[in-house]
């Protein structure tokens, strides 16, 4: 992975976390426009969410695979840290899989992927917090 070799793993981890936080916040703004009237019908928020999603689509699987390989010894014993990491991995993949049809067809057309995407957003947020505060 040539791209990965240019970054220190810590820098890439921070980029992943920042993109997750941005995507979670912008997704909530887009999902609940009645709570944020100033963001209603904001094409800037939508475009930034889409572009950050493309970044996440490329970076997340690459970083996840390297992170899993780097911590393979820890994965052999079950802990809260391992469980939250597994939940992060699968919710991130689910967000990618459910986000692609939403991008192609729109959120007004596809109710089921929209609900899955929204639910996985909260799952990812919770697992990020849990992973951060779990004992290493």
Residues of each region from the PLM?
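Membrane-embedded alpha-helical bundles that constitute the cytochrome b-like, heme-associated redox core
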Residues: 1-136
